[in-house]
């Protein structure tokens, strides 16, 4: 297999890796054909503009939250243990209140007709600043009595956690039975987070998981297309007894959890209704309406749900809800990238450094693929040894392509060379490369993870381009170990391709470039050893098999 085929395969791998989502977009879930009167009323309620916030600030060891005292919305959430993508001196802000972008969590109580019973009422809190004391901090917002109902909204933040419990405490003194439902929403605009680029682009938008429909992405563009097609609002509605829904972006997520791992579903009183749509104000929302059991006069009740708003740390989210780890966006190769990351994580637990874990993983992958790559490289080595004879055939027959081809095929037979012997092994390595790309690119565990020296964040590009330059050098070295091409154009390609690949890798995460560099070094060692072995066999007059 010559270098032209080799680079072609790697180019195919990169094209597939970068363009897969565009070539094979996620199918749209089937929308419900019609809304009920209650659904339309909920939609009208959701269209209310985001009012300016009266801030209540909550600070724990993991987050700083800003809650609007009037509406009770969670309008800003700063993740204190993560740095901003564009400025490492600032913490990462997940939720935004509309100054830079809009991304908030809202919750309401609805009557039987779908009307927000707290609309225009407003909450109040005993103080404006809360901080963690002990394992938990509770923020209680109280609303004036309305319709004979006394309602409190309670946020509970837990030490060391990104789970926020949102609870309504309801006391019915209305003189009649109250039939209510709780509506929970995550609302955001379509702006992309910092750090998104052509080579480092990940999905941003709504996601939903239900046992009936499994995991689905409902992209902003899908919702926009439906809105442009003539619908006043694009909606995806379904009923479910359990699941989760929310928004994801690169490394982070926010999801309402309908059933905690090993716990009871919040939909115990009846199926919950999930609704994903583009609103009239051009904001996008994922919401779930949870029916409550009837509250008799004089009785008390509560509606409680967990919101996970934080990093997509596999070991954490896998224990929060069933299949929540699917929100970690490995693209179309989740089935392959997920076990690769599992192995990488196990190595990290032993070694304690993600960079060295990547190096050890590269060695393991190389060892597993050795039988395949060895056959490929032996084929290339035999082609390299036969290169002078191939050049002589080309010079002898000149433009007589038919005679030239026949002579070359006879040479391949005499030398026991299979010109396509290296193709299949290289093709089988493409899924490995794509899987590793997504395993390294999508994993928040590598965010801000140092290796050594100048590499302080394996999830970002090498700031000094040292690794891409080393990678280019290793690719140039490989060209001298491969069969020299007889075509002058191919010879030029051999010199240009390492430069092209290194420029592309300037923008790739340092962790991925590190993998590629180590893989190249191992390949050089393997190819050099095979070349020397075959040359020695030929020098001794042995038949090379």
Curated annotation (Swiss-Prot):
MF (Gene Ontology):
membrane insertase activity
One record GO biological process:
protein transport
**Keywords attached to this entry:** Cell inner membrane, Cell membrane, Chaperone, Membrane, Protein transport, Transmembrane, Transmembrane helix, Transport
What's in the GO CC field? Answer: plasma membrane
How does this protein lie in the membrane?
Multi-pass membrane protein
The places in or outside the cell where this protein is found are: Cell inner membrane
Question: Known Pfam families for this protein?
Answer: 60KD_IMP (PF02096), YidC_periplas (PF14849)
| Membrane spanning stretches | 350-370, 424-444, 461-481, 498-518
Q: Does the keyword ATP-binding apply?
A: no
Write down the HAMAP family for this protein, in alphabetical order: YidC_type1
Question: What does it do?
Answer: Required for the insertion and/or proper folding and/or complex formation of integral membrane proteins into the membrane. Involved in integration of membrane proteins that insert both dependently and independently of the Sec translocase complex, as well as at least some lipoproteins. Aids folding of multispanning membrane proteins.
NCBIfam families noted in UniProt: PRK01318.1-3, yidC_nterm, yidC_oxa1_cterm
Q: How does it assemble?
A: Interacts with the Sec translocase complex via SecD. Specifically interacts with transmembrane segments of nascent integral membrane proteins during membrane integration.
Family note? Belongs to the OXA1/ALB3/YidC family. Type 1 subfamily.
Which named protein is this?
Answer: Membrane protein insertase YidC
Species this protein is from: Neisseria meningitidis serogroup A / serotype 4A (strain DSM 15465 / Z2491)
